[in-house]
Regions:
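Acidic-basic catalytic patches of nuclease active cores, encompassing PD-(D/E)XK
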Residues: 1-56, 221
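Active-site beta-strand-loop-beta-strand hairpin of nuclease catalytic cores
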Residues: 44-79
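Amphipathic coiled-coil/heptad-repeat helices and related helical stalk/stem segments
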Residues: 63-65, 94-97, 118-121
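Glycine-rich phosphate-binding "P-loop"
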Residues: 78-87
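Nucleic-acid nuclease catalytic cores
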Residues: 86-91, 104-142
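Capsid-like jelly-roll
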Residues: 89, 93, 218-221
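Conserved nucleotide- and phosphate/pyrophosphate-binding catalytic cores
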Residues: 101
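Non-catalytic C-terminal interaction segments of nucleic acid-processing enzymes
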Residues: 125-221
């Protein structure tokens, strides 16, 4: 139970870390049998250029048109797995889970929440990242302090000031950058399910010309 609570808290912190930088975040449903090797924990979207109007990001239509003309991707999509400070074999398992669940996206990233792994484990993760192209970042925080933070639900619901204070507790340390690859045009249709819901949301945002809020944030599948 404590392990599930810690993982939920780590996931909530990762979501808020991404969405406070203006990225779109889609949260996949949690598997009842543990972490999934088919789908990641999050999909993180790098939106097209635009300007904020109130709480909505409105896309620059001329920039979108230029992207279409040169065949550039309309947006970036990153597949993200979140781990609660794995070590040794657990760290490698989480890395390969990230690799396995990111084949559909432009890149994959493993986010470790907790204390920074030791030097040998960091070196091992960097070596794997260099070979397979998966990014690795640690949101560093002492275990004792992480336990003192509010629960996952409170972190998800935190207002701007409260969220900023929570994220100030974290020190992002990038161990390796992701390697980008091409995204297949029919990925959403091919995978279906939650992936289909994700790509339907993104398509609706492009058609509307602005970010359309994903109503439930957490997938209802």
């Amino acid at each position: 139970m404590a392990e599930e609570t810690d993982r939920a808290k780590a996931l909530a912190l990762a979501v808020r870390q991404y969405d406070t930088t203006g990225r779109g975040v889609f949260v996949f449903s949690t598997s009842e049998t543990g972490t999934s090797w088919v789908k990641p924990d999050l999909a993180v979207v790098e939106w097209p250029d635009g300007e904020w109007e109130g709480n909505a990001l409105v896309f620059d239509q001329s920039a979108l048109q230029r992207r279409r003309m040169i065949g550039a991707p309309m947006m970036g999509i990153r597949s993200v797995c979140v781990a609660r400070m794995p070590g040794g074999e657990d760290g490698r398992r989480e890395f390969f889970r990230t690799l396995a669940t990111s084949r559909w996206a432009q890149c994959g990233e493993l986010v470790i929440v907790g204390e920074l792994p030791d030097d040998s484990e960091c070196a091992a993760l960097r070596g794997l990242a260099a070979e397979f192209g998966v990014g690795v970042v640690c949101l560093e925080i002492a275990d004792e302090r992480l336990c003192e933070l509010p629960g996952a639900e409170e972190i998800f619901k935190a207002g701007d000031e409260e969220c900023a204070a929570l994220l100030a507790e974290l020190t992002p340390v990038r161990l390796a950058s992701s390697r980008l690859k091409a995204l297949e045009a029919d990925t959403g249709e091919t995978l279906g399910g939650e992936f289909g819901a994700l790509f339907d949301w993104l398509a609706a945002c492009l058609e509307r010309g602005s970010v359309e809020e994903y109503e439930f944030r957490v997938s209802c599948y």
